[in-house]
């Protein structure tokens, strides 16, 4: 899959960038006169490191796009777009339900939990269930969440991308209806996952 190929280069960029932005490594290799802020070369390695980190930071989304695109029979671009929309809807719904339950980035922070009587181990354990995806506070599902949304989106796309609607609704025929259906289904699945993921997340982290 595309993300797996990207991981190879991302790892290379992170390794190279990380090594040559580390002051101990630079001094150990006697490259302080070359790799520094004056020559600007250190900035090149900082950029390489940042480029590699992007892939790992957004890996679940890339898996979602890859699954949506790769498993679609036709009109793969529309499938990938639907996957992205579905992924966002999925996590936004989870985030809103968590917020209703009083769970936010602040209220699940380790220090806050410890201040409110939770033990150190349980605080870290509970905190590990959550993350922020594209600025959305949600459950930490890693690449499973991306694949889950991507695979379902591809199945929705394959079933409905060639749908013909009555003339009065013809504008929404074909590929245009796929994002609408995807948003609806992923919103429902997001609501369900908001209530069932906690024990699953604990089983993974434990």
Where do the model's predicted regions map?
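Alpha-helical transmembrane segments and immediately membrane-proximal extracytoplasmic
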Residues: 33, 158, 180-183, 202
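Membrane-interface loop-to-helix entry segments
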Residues: 167-184, 205
């Amino acid at each position: 899959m595309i993300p797996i190929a990207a991981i190879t280069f991302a790892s290379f960029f992170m390794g190279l960038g990380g090594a040559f932005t580390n002051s101990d490594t630079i001094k150990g290799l006697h490259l302080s006169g070359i790799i520094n802020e004056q020559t600007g070369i250190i900035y090149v390695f900082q950029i390489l490191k940042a480029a590699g980190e992007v892939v790992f930071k957004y890996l679940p989304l890339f898996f979602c796009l890859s699954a949506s695109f790769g498993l679609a029979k036709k009109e793969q671009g529309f499938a990938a777009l639907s996957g992205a929309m579905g992924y966002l809807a999925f996590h936004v719904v989870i985030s809103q339900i968590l917020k209703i339950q009083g769970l936010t980035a602040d209220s699940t922070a380790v220090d806050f939990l410890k201040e409110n009587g939770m033990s150190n181990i349980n605080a870290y354990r509970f905190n590990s269930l959550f993350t922020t995806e594209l600025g959305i506070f949600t459950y930490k599902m890693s690449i499973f969440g991306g694949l889950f949304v991507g695979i379902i989106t591809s199945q929705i796309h394959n079933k409905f991308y060639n749908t013909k609607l009555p003339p009065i609704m013809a504008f929404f025929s074909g590929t245009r209806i796929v994002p609408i259906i995807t948003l609806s289904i992923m919103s429902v699945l997001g609501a369900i996952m908001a209530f069932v993921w906690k024990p699953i997340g604990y089983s993974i982290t434990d």
